[in-house]
Amino acid sequence: MSAVPLTRMLPLRFLTHLLLLSFIPLYFCMEFSEDARNIEKIRRGNQWAIGHFMGKKSLQDTYNPSEQDMDSEDFRPRIIEMIRGTFRQEPIRALSPRKQDEIQWMLKKIMDDYIKTTQK
């Protein structure tokens, strides 16, 4: 009975694995390179929001209020200016320490409730 020693089988096994594993990445590289050639044939449709042209078309169609809108209750110029002033001043105004504590307490309560519901 002739048995092949283990020391002689290990190099052959290593060589076999090396050859097999070297072809697997080659197969995937070839598969992806073939798909890249077919991308040119895909119809892409309207590409107005691509790259540096992004948003150009949508800015041309902005809303212009009509006279009827300006006369309505919602579009009075004074109300619009008050709203703009509020938005400009809001980030500048600092919160009082009491208000900060209230907000922190609410956020803590929300987070606690969230953690309790996710653990169930």
Swiss-Prot record:
InterPro entries found in the cross-reference section: Bombesin
Chain positions listed as propeptide in the UniProt record: 30-44, 58-120
Tissue spec: Brain, intestine, and ovaries and early embryos (stages 2 and 10).
Modified residues (Methionine amide): 54
Keywords on record: Amidation, Cleavage on pair of basic residues, Secreted, Signal
Record flagged with keyword Flavoprotein: no
Protein name, entry field: Neuromedin-B
UniProt entry tagged with the keyword ATP-binding: no
Function: Stimulates smooth muscle contraction.
Top-level taxon in the UniProt lineage: Eukaryota
Biological processes annotated in GO: neuropeptide signaling pathway
GO CC terms in record: extracellular region
Family of this protein: Belongs to the bombesin/neuromedin-B/ranatensin family.
Signal peptide: 1-29
UniProt subcellular location: Secreted
